[in-house]
Amino acid sequence: MKNIAIIGASGYTGAQLTALIHAEAELTIQGLYVSENSLDKGKPLADLYPSYSHIALTLSPLSDDAKSKIVAEADAVVLATEHSVSLHLAAWFYSQGLAVFDLSGAYRFSDVAQYPKWYGFEHEYPEVLAKAVYGLAEWNAKEIAATKMIAVPGCYPTASLTALKPLVSLLTSAYPVINAVSGVTGAGRKAQLHTSFCEVSLTPYGVLGHRHQPEIATQLGQEVIFTPHLGNFKRGILATITVQLKPGTTTADVAAAYSVYAQAPLVTVKHNQFPKVDDVVLTPNCHLGWKFDENSGYLVVASAIDNLMKGAASQALQCIKIHFNL
């Protein structure tokens, strides 16, 4: 039995992960935490999320005493916190010997030079960063098992990389073009005008400047063009990706590349059949559908995930179970 502390449990991702861990026979929840300044401190989780009324846990402030209690009682800590907050908390808990599963972007780049540009801060813990593993569960299981610092991928990168990584040996130098739509939960729980009921509408954002673009490119080993879109639905991501493959590539070659997922229970791959967001919402699954034109050499692959599940909480749970061999 492994004991897990969840910090940032009041947000969509933290609450979703709480529900997932609560349902696991081999995991227990050491505690749920929010910042000392949070208006949610002291509230039962079910006050914020009535659908979790079966989870009788209260949100505690992350005081120094609480941090010491976590170190004494927990085997691992999950951080569903802002990037700049995770930066410091992850390094501290790692230094105390706990396994850290960070859902922010604070440890996703191995190159410290990326952080000022994409996250607005200098990375102060290069020695911890050097130990961090990118937690793309289907691809980095051995590394996840071997380290105590796991950077859980972003939602768009999870959808995109799951679709693209099998194709690496078939790609030309042409940039893959990724157009992806996410539900509004991807913007977080905080009230914002552009995600309010009357304002939300299908629109691109972060064009040629979203921080997930270099995350995808770094993990793929090739530059990409990535355009995210805000959709007028609650949860889910659909990424439609167009790539040029090497001359002479056949449909059979593409099918062989995607056979890498034959033993991956959470990834479904279909040829000439494309996924729907509704089919993956509230599941830990990724559905891929692809079609290849041998004459032009272009392939289109669509990837559907739940942004709060496979794109965040359920992938964190995958990483926890891989790390602890559960």
Curated annotation (Swiss-Prot):
Main location: cytoplasm
Active-site positions on this chain: 155
Entry superkingdom: Bacteria
Keywords (A to Z) from UniProt: Amino-acid biosynthesis, Arginine biosynthesis, Cytoplasm, NADP, Oxidoreductase
Protein name listed in UniProt: N-acetyl-gamma-glutamyl-phosphate reductase
GO molecular function term, any single one: N-acetyl-gamma-glutamyl-phosphate reductase activity
PANTHER family, A to Z: N-ACETYL-GAMMA-GLUTAMYL-PHOSPHATE REDUCTASE, CHLOROPLASTIC-RELATED, N-ACETYL-GAMMA-GLUTAMYL-PHOSPHATE REDUCTASE, CHLOROPLASTIC-RELATED-RELATED
Source organism of the structure: Shewanella baltica (strain OS195)
EC number: 1.2.1.38
Key word Isomerase present: no
Chemical reaction(s) catalysed: N-acetyl-L-glutamate 5-semialdehyde + phosphate + NADP(+) = N-acetyl-L-glutamyl 5-phosphate + NADPH + H(+)
Coiled coil, from the record: none
Family designation: Belongs to the NAGSA dehydrogenase family. Type 1 subfamily.
Pathway the protein contributes to: Amino-acid biosynthesis; L-arginine biosynthesis; N(2)-acetyl-L-ornithine from L-glutamate: step 3/4
Locations listed in the record: Cytoplasm
InterPro entries linked to this entry: AGPR_AS (IPR023013), AGPR_type-1 (IPR000706), NAD(P)-bd_dom_sf (IPR036291), NAGSA_dehydrogenase (IPR050085), Semialdehyde_DH_NAD-bd (IPR000534)
GO annotation (BP), single: L-arginine biosynthetic process
GO cellular component, one term: cytoplasm
Record function comment: Catalyzes the NADPH-dependent reduction of N-acetyl-5-glutamyl phosphate to yield N-acetyl-L-glutamate 5-semialdehyde.
